Structure formats: structure tokens, C-alpha cells
């Protein structure tokens, strides 16, 4: 783990999800897309700019690499931080979609499933409606273009049937 950190601001529920899954400070897996994105945008620190940290910012460890040693390359510009935040938000959306896409199978309401998902992923339940609406917008945007990703057939565990 690197002792160099970068601070990026996120929506509160994404910050909670990050800290729950990757610790505080956040340390991504070695070969992850997030680390690749961070490494891609790392540059030398321009001049003697001090690192500023906002109240809601999440501390993320900068991955070390042979091509860009963290001692020299430890700065992300404002736009680079936005790009890394987009990459992390995509990972969040992927997990939300994968975990809730087949919710029709369990015969419960979407809101109760989202609340359970929040609890399982370290997110305050106060964001349940926000995440429910996010999920519904994702699903509806596909449906609008004629792509129905909901399961239509019954999944059977028993292979004899």
C-alpha cells in the first residue's frame, strides 16, 4: 500500500460504498480498472501546490508502478479526478445492476430489495429512494430502446425437472 493519497469527492452513498468495500483510505485491487485509470492520469505535482481535502472527500491510495513511481507521480488534476470518479461510479452502477437486476424472482418490492442491498453494502438506508430511482432509470432507459434485460423464464435449480 502506498503512503501517497489522492482526495476525490463523491456522492455520499458512493463514498459509503467505497469505504465499506475497499477500506479507509480506499485501496483498490492490484489489477483493477480503477487503479489503471488512476495510473493513467497521474502526473508530477505542478510547483508546490498543497493537497487540499474537502470535508466529504474520500482518500484513495495511489498505486505504485514501475512506469510511474508514486514518489514522483502523485498528482491528479481536477479533470483527472473527475475521470477517476466516473470510473468508480461505473463500478458502483455495475454492482447495483448485477445485484438487483433479477429482483422480480424473489417476489418482494423493489424498495425493500434496495434497502437490503444498502445494508449489505454499507450504505445508509436513507438513500433507499435515491438508489431505487437510479436503478429504475437504468432499467427504463434500456426498455425505451427495446432492450428488456428482465428475466422472463423461471430459473430452476433442480436439473431433473
Predicted feature locations:
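Short, charged amphipathic recognition helices of the HTH superfamily
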Residues: 101-121
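Short, basic alpha-helical nucleic acid-contact segments in DNA-binding proteins
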Residues: 134-149
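Short, basic interhelical loop/turn and adjoining N-cap
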Residues: 116-132
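Intrinsically disordered, low-complexity basic tails/linkers immediately adjacent to helix-turn-helix/homeobox/MYB/SANT
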Residues: 148-161
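Positively charged, polyanion-binding regions of nucleic-acid-associated proteins
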Residues: 84-105
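Intrinsically disordered, low-complexity linear regions
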Residues: 64, 134, 158-160
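Alpha-helix N-cap/helix-initiation sites
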Residues: 89, 107-111, 124-129
Amino acid at each position: 500500500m502506498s503512503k501517497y493519497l489522492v482526495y476525490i469527492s463523491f456522492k455520499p452513498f458512493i463514498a459509503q460504498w467505497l469505504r465499506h468495500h475497499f477500506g479507509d483510505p480506499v485501496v483498490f485491487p492490484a489489477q483493477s480498472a480503477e487503479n489503471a485509470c488512476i495510473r493513467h492520469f497521474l502526473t508530477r505535482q505542478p510547483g508546490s501546490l498543497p493537497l487540499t481535502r474537502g470535508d466529504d472527500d474520500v482518500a484513495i491510495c495511489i498505486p505504485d508502478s514501475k512506469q510511474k513511481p508514486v514518489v514522483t507521480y502523485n498528482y491528479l488534476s481536477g479533470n483527472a479526478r473527475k475521470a477517476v470518479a466516473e470510473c468508480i461510479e461505473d463500478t458502483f452502477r455495475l454492482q447495483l445492476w448485477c445485484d438487483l437486476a433479477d429482483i422480480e424472482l424473489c417476489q418482494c418490492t423493489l424498495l425493500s430489495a434496495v434497502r437490503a442491498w444498502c445494508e449489505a453494502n454499507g450504505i445508509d438506508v436513507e438513500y433507499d429512494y435515491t438508489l431505487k430511482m437510479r436503478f429504475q432509470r437504468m432499467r427504463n432507459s434500456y426498455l425505451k430502446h427495446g432492450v428488456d434485460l428482465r428475466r422472463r423464464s423461471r430459473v430452476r435449480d433442480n436439473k431433473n425437472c
